[in-house]
Amino acid sequence: MGIKKHIPNSITCCNLISGCIATTFAFIGDAKLALCWIVIGAVFDFFDGMSARLLNVSSPIGKELDSLADDVTFGVAPATILFSELNVLEYPGPLLGIKDFIPYVAFLMAAFSALRLAKFNLDKRQTTSFIGLPTPANALFWGSLIVSNPSWIEGTSYSFAFLLAMLAISCYLLVSELPMFALKFKHWGWKDNEVKYCFAALSLICLVVFGIFEAWWIIISLYLLGSILLWWRAKA
């Protein structure tokens, strides 16, 4: 039991280390390797919770450690990717005087990710689904967007405004009350899992067609749209 109880927290620490490595690559402008380490961190994040359930071990420190690791991997790392991207964009003449300060706005993503994780820890409604955009989904969206569309993003002197508008939307979604489905299964049957299986299949198709790095922003966009449609249908 002595070793077994430390396994989930050890996996969580691997998530944290992955986030630190992702952040270092993001700072030097290597968004692709940063995204790679975010994906690795997401894998560790998936298995730390699974291992805790399978081994039937839990501790108060585990939940707090998981949130701290998640904010580094899914908050600080993607914020740094956006920071580096905003640093290399062109800015119109009137903003040249403050262009060195604009990239730091990207770190609002880390702050709102921390708020989202704190809210998740206290919210008893999020056992089988999510309320607000999960931080891993947000991180994968931003990392993939920057990796797959540099020419499109850097195409005009107003690309920064588009990215900042998207940043504002994603920060709002992180702490919003929008219900979002989760890939959490109580059983493996088709009934009650139709949306989850269809989304998983669609995600796999996107990964095959667009590539393991480029597909994620499309997948997360579909996830968001699907959640909104399900919410509207439930309200109707």
Residue ranges and their predicted role:
Residues 1-46, 193, 211, 215-219, ...:
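Topogenic membrane-insertion module of multi-pass membrane proteins
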Residues 8-12, 54-118:
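Multi-pass membrane catalytic core of lipid/isoprenoid biosynthesis enzymes
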Residues 11-14, 34-41, 105-112, 138, ...:
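Hydrophobic alpha-helical transmembrane segments of polytopic
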Residues 17, 43, 47-51, 68, ...:
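Active-site His/Glu-centered metal-binding helix of metallohydrolases
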Residues 20-23, 40, 78, 111-114, ...:
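Alpha-helical transmembrane segments of polytopic integral membrane proteins
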Residues 21-36, 78-104, 145-162, 209-213:
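Helix-coil boundary and interhelical linker segments in multi-pass alpha-helical membrane proteins
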Residues 48-59, 120-124, 128, 181-186:
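Cytosolic, membrane-interface loops and tails of multi-pass inner-membrane proteins
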Residues 128-236:
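C-terminal membrane-associated helical module and adjoining short loops/tails
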